[in-house]
């Protein structure tokens, strides 16, 4: 009798475990893990609308934002694409200046501009989606994915949070004849140079923060190795296409150089393409504020990433030096003694500058893009004071 009860109990336990397993699989299919027919994880739009803003709220904030814009940017001198939204709803946007002075094209809401290092926010998102779907892990050694990668202690996480200790490819390829500047450098070439020229680390891995574009060039290679797609195609399939980001693409130096919006020095002199413009992951995404808003809004979807991964994304990792600035997994942050953490990412490449601000608590998105060099772009952080407990003042002078 005892053995029969024991057997019956075991059978019930097996049925229970199977049912739990099935329910988890169903939840994954509908929730955290969104995988397309090709086995590629895809970012899904937010299905449920966020609370609708009142007309009074929109008018109040629009007044403050528009005054800031008009005081900061001039139609005679600036090229800028600017957008402020809350709950995915646009409060104010403005577009002015030349996208291309040679052709006379102007900046419009549909005109893609180079978003520089804001590209890192999208690259890191694609990597975290691969982590969420268990295709890779944060602690996985990079040399298990990229063949001949020369630094055995570097992990995916230390690439994401800039603690790998690697040197910037822009410097070591320029030095000592390490690369022929007449030839376009590729992501694969970076690995080749690091190996053949025995490029040393700047510091031991995971001993301190060192912002380095090489980290995100390697992450782009990881995306390629894991998905079997080239980075531009992977980003389109994983993020751009499912979110309807129709004006967003990764620059292809072989076919896009004559159709992109060029960048300019502050004196309006056009800046040409150089040997570093074939590298992607750290930069080279072209987009619009409206497309980037689609991306940011989708990050509020309940199953964007699992909660634990989101927590890791928005935490600081580098506290060796005192200060309030830190870096998460693809996002910069300022951790004030009082008030909310301030999450953002700035960018600068050639004459392109960019600023992407995500006020998480308030669900506010602030985006500024410019293809004519200016530090005014980074002043957008002051707008946070209109929406929450952030120690910025709209009337502060100076540039950062």
Range-by-range predicted roles:
Residues 1-10:
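Bacterial N-terminal signal peptides that target proteins for export
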Residues 19-21:
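C-terminal motif of bacterial Sec signal peptides marking the signal peptidase cleavage site
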Residues 32, 40, 154-350:
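Short, surface-exposed loop or secondary-structure junction motifs
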Residues 355-372:
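Short, well-ordered beta-strand elements
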């Amino acid at each position: 009798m005892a053995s029969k009860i024991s057997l019956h109990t075991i059978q019930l336990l097996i049925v229970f475990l199977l049912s739990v397993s099935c329910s988890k699989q169903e939840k994954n299919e509908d929730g955290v893990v969104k995988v397309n027919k090709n086995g590629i994880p895809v970012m899904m739009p937010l299905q449920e609308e966020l609370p609708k803003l009142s007309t009074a709220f929109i008018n109040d904030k629009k007044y403050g934002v528009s005054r800031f814009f008009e005081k900061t940017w001039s139609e005679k001198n600036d090229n800028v694409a600017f957008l402020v939204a809350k709950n995915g709803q646009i409060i104010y946007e403005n577009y002015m200046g030349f996208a291309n002075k040679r052709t006379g094209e102007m900046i419009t809401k549909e005109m893609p501009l180079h978003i520089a290092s804001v590209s890192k926010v999208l690259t890191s998102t694609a990597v975290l989606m691969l982590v969420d779907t268990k295709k890779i892990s944060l602690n996985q050694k990079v040399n298990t994915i990229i063949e001949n990668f020369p630094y055995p202690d570097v992990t995916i996480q230390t690439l994401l949070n800039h603690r790998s200790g690697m040197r910037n490819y822009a410097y070591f390829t320029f030095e000592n004849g390490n690369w022929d500047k007449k030839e376009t450098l590729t992501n694969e070439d970076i690995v080749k140079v690091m190996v053949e020229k025995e490029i040393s680390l700047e510091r031991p891995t995971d001993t301190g923060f060192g912002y380095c574009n090489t980290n995100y060039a390697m992450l782009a290679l990881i995306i390629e190795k894991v998905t079997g797609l080239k980075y531009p195609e992977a980003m389109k399939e994983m993020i751009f296409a499912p979110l309807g980001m129709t004006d967003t693409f990764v620059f292809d130096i072989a076919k896009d150089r004559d159709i992109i919006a060029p960048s300019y020095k502050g004196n309006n002199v056009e800046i040409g393409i150089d040997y570093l413009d074939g590298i992607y992951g750290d930069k080279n995404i072209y987009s619009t504020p409206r497309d980037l808003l689609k991306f940011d809004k989708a990050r509020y979807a309940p199953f964007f990433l699992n909660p634990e991964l989101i927590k890791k994304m928005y935490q600081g990792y580098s506290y060796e030096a005192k200060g309030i600035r830190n870096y998460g997994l693809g996002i910069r942050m300022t951790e004030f003694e009082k008030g909310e953490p301030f999450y953002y990412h700035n960018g600068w490449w050639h004459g392109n500058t960019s600023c992407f601000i995500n006020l998480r608590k308030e669900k506010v998105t602030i985006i500024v893009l410019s293809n004519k060099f200016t530090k005014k772009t980074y002043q957008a952080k002051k707008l946070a004071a209109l929406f929450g407990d952030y120690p910025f003042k709209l009337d502060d002078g100076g540039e950062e």
